[in-house]
């Protein structure tokens, strides 16, 4: 009996899932709108969501556009250093680097956020490597260092990360996050940096080489990133597994996109990235323009595609067929409701690749489907949320 108890305890310990709660906050776009700064920002900054996926090969000077995070609403807390210094970050499956503001940065954008102080960490190790994160007309520049990162109860030692030294421009002052924690593949990591999850797995800190994401539609909370396991209480039915078509981003093949049984986009298949770091559902501008027309969306002065809220009751599902399985998006998912009105969850952008133009399955899609990012088998698992 004692042996049975011991074996069950070992099994439980091997399957332990480390969870990071995600809090839903107002997006940077909404903060800028409330401050009356959005119009000025849009005039001086060219927002190109595609730029995130058009980076040149990783180099010593990393560049990662920040405009892509304008509409992000889900954020989690990590600790860096010994003792840990807390930071609010975006858990981003569309990038691979970790960076946060540092005390070396004195710009207003940095002063309004948590800043890492290497001198207050007994485990920090500096390097001579530089980092650059581009946005609009300027860029955040910084250095790379190593330290211990606390994430969801995991102690990730000797983790490389970026420390900002300059953050020009005023818009980052209102950002609801301090930094970014990338969860894509090492092949797209800037400066040859080892991504956080790779470092965690290499140290044997989780029992399964995967992590999973649940994004709640609830404004209060409930969203979570889980490292090292799958919690079936967050979804219904079985997970459907989709092999990756590229081990860079979490890239998969979509068979077709239909409405009322008719193909409206992605005829003959297309490539898509499952990206927690993109709020909307993005695709080629021509295809998205057609979809916006189907759902009656029109652009307002803030660059948003406005939809009549009453249309939610009459619009049809938009169905993504992936690896032979249909994933319907109801209008309540792709029409975003707020106190200011209703907007389309679709966004046009052009990302040409050798295999055609890319689609981005962002939070609009992930809110409907519990997602497993399986590094061990290079696949994505999808199931309807519970």
Swiss-Prot record:
Peptidase A1 domain location: 74-383
Name-wise, this protein is: Pepsin A
Q: Which PANTHER family match?
A: BETA-SITE APP-CLEAVING ENZYME, ISOFORM A-RELATED, PEPSIN A-3-RELATED
Gene Ontology BP annotations: digestion; proteolysis
Entries under PROSITE patterns matching the protein? ASP_PROTEASE, PEPTIDASE_A1
The annotated active site, in chain numbering, is 92, 275
Please name every pair of cysteines joined by a disulfide bond in this record.
105-110, 266-270, 309-342
Keyword DNA-binding part of the UniProt annotation: no
Record EC number: 3.4.23.1
Q: Which is a Gene Ontology cellular component entry for this protein? A: extracellular region
């Amino acid at each position: 009996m004692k042996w049975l108890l011991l074996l069950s305890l070992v099994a439980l310990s091997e399957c332990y899932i480390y969870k990071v709660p995600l809090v839903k906050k107002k997006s940077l776009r909404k903060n800028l709108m409330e401050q009356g700064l959005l119009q000025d920002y849009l005039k001086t900054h060219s927002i190109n969501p595609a730029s995130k996926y058009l980076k040149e090969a990783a180099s010593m000077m990393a560049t990662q556009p920040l405009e892509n995070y304008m509409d992000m609403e889900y954020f989690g807390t990590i600790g860096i250093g010994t003792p840990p210094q807390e930071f609010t970050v975006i858990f981003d499956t569309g990038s691979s680097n970790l960076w946060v503001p540092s005390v070396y940065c004195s710009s207003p954008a940095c002063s309004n956020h948590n800043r890492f102080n290497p001198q207050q960490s007994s485990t920090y190790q500096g390097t001579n490597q530089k980092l650059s994160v581009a946005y609009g007309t300027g860029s955040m520049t910084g250095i790379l260092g190593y330290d211990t990162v606390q994430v969801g109860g995991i102690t990730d030692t000797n983790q490389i990360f970026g420390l900002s030294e300059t953050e020009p421009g005023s818009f980052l002052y209102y950002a609801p996050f301090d930094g970014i924690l990338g969860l894509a593949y090492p092949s797209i990591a800037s400066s040859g940096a080892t991504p956080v999850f790779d470092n965690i797995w290499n140290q044997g800190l989780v029992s399964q080489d995967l992590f999973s994401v649940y994004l709640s539609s609830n404004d209060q909370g409930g969203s979570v990133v889980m490292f090292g396991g799958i919690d079936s209480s967050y979804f219904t039915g079985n997970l459907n597994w989709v092999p990756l078509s590229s081990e860079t981003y979490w890239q998969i093949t979509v068979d077709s996109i239909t409405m009322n049984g008719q193909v409206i986009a992605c005829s003959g298949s297309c490539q898509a990235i499952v990206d927690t770091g993109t709020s909307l559902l993005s695709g080629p501008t021509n295809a998205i323009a057609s979809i916006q027309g189907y759902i009656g969306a029109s652009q307002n002065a803030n660059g948003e595609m406005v939809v009549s809220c009453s249309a939610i009751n009459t619009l049809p599902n938009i169905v993504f067929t992936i690896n032979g399985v249909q994933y319907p998006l109801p209008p309540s998912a792709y029409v975003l409701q707020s106190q200011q009105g209703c907007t389309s969850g679709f966004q046009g952008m052009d990302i040409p690749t050798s295999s055609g133009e890319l689609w981005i399955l962002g939070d609009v899609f992930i809110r409907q489907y519990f997602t497993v990012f399986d590094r061990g088998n290079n696949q994505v698992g999808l199931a309807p949320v519970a």
